Amino acid sequence: MLTSGIVILSGGLLDPNPGLIFWTAVTFVIVLLILKKFAWGPILGALEEREKAIQSSIDRAHTAKDEAEAALRKNKELLTKADAEAEKILREGKEYGEKLRADIVEKAHSEATKMISSAKEEIEQEKRRALDELRNEVADLAVQGAEKILMANLDADKQKAIVSSMIQDLSKHRN
């Protein structure tokens, strides 16, 4: 029926229509088959490719992480060895420095002792030489005094004057 340009269908929206249900089901199955044939395969293939790429990236990341951890452990070991070696070198250098210092001090002490000994010996020689010289002068003066006394048989006052004169001569010779 047609009333004022509007077609009124009989039945409501909630009333089951077997023809509509059949054609809806057939259309759904056809669309499902078309999607399965043309879209489902490529979509699943793309998803599988993406999954493989992600898994490959994860595997590479794990491998890189393991390699980095191994390198880090190796670097830590090398650093520990280098620290130990540096400490050993410093300790050996310190020991060598101490030994060298002790050797230098001992050598300087030995040289100082030698120099002191040499200086003492030289002083002793100079002292002996001066004493020998003094003895010779005293002996010469005594001989001269004895000569003068013997030559001049003089009285006590003159002898005292001669001895005083000799003492003055002795003082002059010493200076």
Swiss-Prot record:
Major localisation: membrane
InterPro entries: ATP_synth_B-like_membr_sf, ATP_synth_b/b'su_bac/chlpt, ATP_synth_F0_bsu_bac, ATP_synthase_B_chain
GO cellular component: plasma membrane; proton-transporting ATP synthase complex
Membrane-crossing segments per the record: 20-40
Keyword Cell membrane recorded: yes
Molecular-function annotations in GO: proton-transporting ATP synthase activity, rotational mechanism; proton-transporting ATPase activity, rotational mechanism
Localization in the cell: Cell inner membrane
Family: Belongs to the ATPase B chain family.
Function: F(1)F(0) ATP synthase produces ATP from ADP in the presence of a proton or sodium gradient. F-type ATPases consist of two structural domains, F(1) containing the extramembraneous catalytic core and F(0) containing the membrane proton channel, linked together by a central stalk and a peripheral stalk. During catalysis, ATP synthesis in the catalytic domain of F(1) is coupled via a rotary mechanism of the central stalk subunits to proton translocation. Component of the F(0) channel, it forms part of the peripheral stalk, linking F(1) to F(0).
Alphabetical list of HAMAP family matching this protein: ATP_synth_b_bprime (MF_01398)
The name this protein goes by in its record: ATP synthase subunit b 2
Gene name of this polypeptide: atpF2
